[in-house]
């Protein structure tokens, strides 16, 4: 399978190595990527604490033309210049209250998260649809349901072999392999309550515009789980490290 290098360059990245240099602290870098004034568009830039001292750079948007520009920057500034083994993104979906479609789409690479509120957009973003089925490899959990949701909501299929289910890579020896249990074993113990600490009432608000701060933070942390686990898989495999209480299945 393909894996992701933590030091890969991205349109959001101000330093050349996430592991050795500090991330930028100003949202001005984010807005400099956009062809619009940040005062005239419903876009927010923020930092979210994932765990410990690990900060996430998060962009929240609900305009399709902004997402199109982001994907163009992503391709030109990062994807086209990355090595094959670095072309790996996290993919996550949040659902509306009736569970019949997609409310929010998240893309993540390294510590940088795009949250696109599909439910509040004009639902006309062919560039995003093309990006999803362009052959890029995505990491996720519960991919069978995701495939059904994308087929129903977008009428698209991510190519076979381009959507990797992390639950087929990792198996916990003493716990069921849920997202929370995997995050505790592979990333940090603080992820143990990431599901239960998020109020159930907020799950009904993924279509609310703008999203509440708690929803944005939850989406960012949940989504970064995918790329963090992928990076952990890569580092442990390359270094022949045995993960405590975790079996690597491939």
Task: Show which residues each predicted segment covers.
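Conserved DEDDh/DEDDy metal-dependent 3′-5′ exonuclease domain
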Residues: 57-73, 84-89, 95-232
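N-terminal accessory regions of nucleic-acid-interacting proteins
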Residues: 2-14, 18-89, 166, 239-250
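Acidic two-metal-ion nuclease catalytic site recognized across multiple nuclease folds
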Residues: 220-221, 225-250
